[in-house]
Regions:
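A short beta-strand motif characteristic of beta-propeller blades
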Residues: 25-28, 63-69, 75, 114-125, ...
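Repeated scaffold domains used in trafficking and secretory/extracellular systems
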Residues: 30-36, 72-82, 126-135, 170-181, ...
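Short coil/turn segments that connect the beta-strands within blades of beta-propeller domains
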Residues: 41-43, 82-84, 139-141, 181-183, ...
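Short loop/turn segments that connect beta-strands within beta-propeller blades
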Residues: 59-61, 110-112, 158-162, 198-201, ...
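Asp-box/WD-like beta-propeller blade repeats and closely related beta-sheet repeat scaffolds
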Residues: 113-155, 159-177
């Protein structure tokens, strides 16, 4: 009996010794993997909010392809598929919300959504979710970043040589609209457009102003401008639309047309009319020349109100071709540039909804989008 007990005790001691040896052995560190994305697809889009992540969605199936990390003060992202890079401005404070501020232009590798480089900028970039606060010029070398302190200026960045080129004063003007080679337009508070031209090294070589074509006190232009392929569509708070272009260094301001018919105006009254509105109220499908707008009935200065309907316009014929009521209020609007466009919509509950852009039928909703606030929706293209 004593021999049996002794054998049992020895067996127990052996197990304890083995366990102790196993516990003391170092566990190999697990290495994080790095997935490689397939080629960017025209159905992919970005949803960016203030919470530090831009989600890359595929509108074809509603799946998340990955996330791009950014600061809480990032304004928008510019994607350059030909170089497989994206550019965004990050602003950081040494004490999170106070202290020394550092602004950088972050270069993202779009093959795996990791950071490739940082280029330090003057610590004065505007920090609103507005697509037009950053622009890539068509030399695919210079990125223009809008600053406001409240003095207005732009920072010019060479993303090929990875360096800050310089700062250009743009007093009274905002929104970067790339046009001819190394040139960009800006909207100005005096009702004009400003054209700034750069040299090959990114320094300013010329600027000019257009004639006055709108009154900021009577009918302001939205900051949400849409690239047409040859120029930019500008829309006012009352629904006046026109295209502006630059031809051989000359600013061409197209004739305005109205989103509202006489019947639309009669549907309203002296206080409330149909108006465009929302955080991101417009989208344009370039090849089909279809202009989509979030619309609501409201008083003057309700341009931030979410839309209850989507109106669709043929910009060639300058007339509405469709309208449909939404089962929710739309906040941000984007249209893919696929042959058959998809409409991407966000709402106040941070959900995303995807519609067929021709049939205007719901394809899917993404209830758990990961977004925590109003989202800026962007295509993975240089000017969208």
């Amino acid at each position: 009996m004593q021999i049996v007990r002794l054998l049992a005790l020895l067996a127990l001691l052996s197990l304890l010794a083995a366990a102790a040896a196993s516990a003391s052995a170092p566990i190999p560190a697990e290495k994080a993997g790095k997935a490689v994305l397939p080629e960017l697809q025209p159905s992919w889009f970005l949803a960016l909010d203030y919470d530090g992540a831009a989600y890359v969605f595929d509108g074809a199936d509603g799946e998340v392809k990955g996330t791009i990390s950014h600061s809480q003060y990032t304004t928008a992202i510019v994607t350059l598929p030909s170089r497989k890079e994206a550019y965004l401005v990050d602003s950081y404070y040494s004490r999170l919300v106070r202290g020394t501020r550092t602004d950088v232009l972050t270069v993202v590798d779009m093959s795996n959504l990791t950071t490739k480089a940082e280029i330090q900028l003057p610590a004065k970039t505007a920090t609103l979710l507005i697509r037009g606060h950053i622009g890539l010029l068509n030399d695919e070398r210079h990125v223009v970043v809008f600053n406001m302190t409240p003095a207005q200026s732009v920072s010019i960045v060479d993303v090929v040589d990875r360096k800050f080129v310089g700062e250009i004063s743009t007093a009274g003007c905002a929104i970067v609209m790339p046009v001819e080679l190394r040139s960009f337009l800006m909207l100005c508070g005096d009702g004009t457009l400003q054209l700034i031209e750069l040299s090959a090294d990114g320094s300013e070589v010329g600027r000019r102003r257009s004639k006055v074509f709108f009154d900021v006190n009577k009918d302001p232009v939205f900051s949400e401008v849409k690239y047409t392929g040859s120029g930019w569509l500008l829309t006012t708070h009352n629904g006046s639309v026109r295209e502006v272009r630059v031809v051989s260094g000359r600013i061409d301001i197209g004739e305005a047309w109205s989103m509202l018919t006489d019947e639309d105006r009669q549907d309203g009254n002296t206080k409330e009319q149909w108006r465009p509105g929302g955080m991101q109220p417009f989208a344009l499908h370039r090849s089909a020349a279809l202009f989509y707008a979030l619309m609501h009935k409201g008083k003057v200065d309700t341009h931030g109100q979410d839309g209850k309907e989507i109106w669709v316009f043929d910009t060639n014929r300058r007339r509405r071709v469709a309208r449909f009521a939404l089962p929710f209020e739309g906040r941000s609007l984007l249209v893919s540039q696929e042959a058959v466009p998809r409409i991407y919509l966000s709402d106040k509950d941070h959900k995303l909804h995807i519609y067929d852009g021709y049939k205007l039928k719901l394809q899917r909703s993404i209830d758990d989008s990961g977004l925590s606030g109003g989202a800026l929706l962007q295509a993975l293209m240089p000017y969208d």
